[in-house]
Amino acid sequence: MSLLTEVETYVLSIIPSGPLKAEIAQRLEDVFAGKNTDLEVLMEWLKTRPILSPLTKGVLGFVFTLTVPSERGLQRRRFVQNALNGNGDPNNMDKAVKLYRKLKREITFYGAKEVALSYSTGALASCMGLIYNRMGTVTTEVAFGLVCATCEQIADSQHRSHRQMVTTTNPLIRHENRMVLASTTAKAMEQMAGSSEQAAEAMEVASQARQMVQAMRTVGTHPSSSAGLKDDLLENLQAYQKRMGVQLQRFK
């Protein structure tokens, strides 16, 4: 796996699924391929994206700034600086300075990532802030190691919270989660259908699922009544994908 592929993997792991994630993935690919060369336009686009947390925007802004060549005097963006200030906690800043000194001695991506992983997310963000604000310099490879360590910490906490939701015994939360997943799967089916011969069938199945979810939410149902809904829909989607010869992994 190349360095940029690894960076893209880690960065995308902290972005919520949806159309915006696909859009960001495309921007990252363009940036890493040297196609998107106007940093000002890119940062303005990032600043106005909905849904993303300030820290996620800060990480993306840092990656774009590292990768896209820019004029020397180009102004640093306030939304990135605010996201990478470690919540203004002096403790985070002290740790960030210590981490920065260690990173200065590193020369490889993996070395930097390993060193950084022993610090908290706040300290890692503050350290990125130091580098972003030109208060310190490290090689691009080391900076990317810092980025990936930060993403790993964020993804770990997101995974813990997701696991808590999936394993919750609260039937109302489980019921709503199944309906949300059914709606998301229906949307995926509609997007995949495109103009193929089986498109009408896929759209019909997706439409029925949406109507079912809408009815269940409107009328109110017993929390166990949605148990088979998502599974049925996924089975339909996978059968449709097999006929179309599409990879299944993406929707598992």
Curated annotation (Swiss-Prot):
It comes from the Viruses. SMART domains: Flu_M1_C. It is a peripheral membrane protein. A motif (Nuclear localization signal) lies at residues 101-105. It holds the Pfam family Flu_M1. One of its GO terms (cellular component) is membrane. Residues 165-252 are annotated as: RNP-binding. GO terms for biological process: viral budding from plasma membrane. Most abundant protein in virion. When expressed alone can form virus-like particles in transfected cells. Homodimer and homomultimer. Interacts with NEP. Binds ribonucleocapsid by both interacting with genomic RNA and NP protein. May interact with HA and NA. Cannot bind NP without genomic RNA. Plays critical roles in virus replication, from virus entry and uncoating to assembly and budding of the virus particle. M1 binding to ribonucleocapsids (RNPs) in nucleus seems to inhibit viral transcription. Interaction of viral NEP with M1-RNP is thought to promote nuclear export of the complex, which is targeted to the virion assembly site at the apical plasma membrane in polarized epithelial cells. Interactions with NA and HA may bring M1, a non-raft-associated protein, into lipid rafts. Forms a continuous shell on the inner side of the lipid bilayer in virion, where it binds the RNP. Determines the virion's shape: spherical or filamentous. Clinical isolates of influenza are characterized by the presence of significant proportion of filamentous virions, whereas after multiple passage on eggs or cell culture, virions have only spherical morphology. Filamentous virions are thought to be important to infect neighboring cells, and spherical virions more suited to spread through aerosol between hosts organisms. Belongs to the influenza viruses Matrix protein M1 family. This is Matrix protein 1. It comes from Influenza A virus (strain A/Chicken/Weybridge H7N7). The lineage of its organism: Viruses, Riboviria, Orthornavirae, Negarnaviricota, Polyploviricotina.
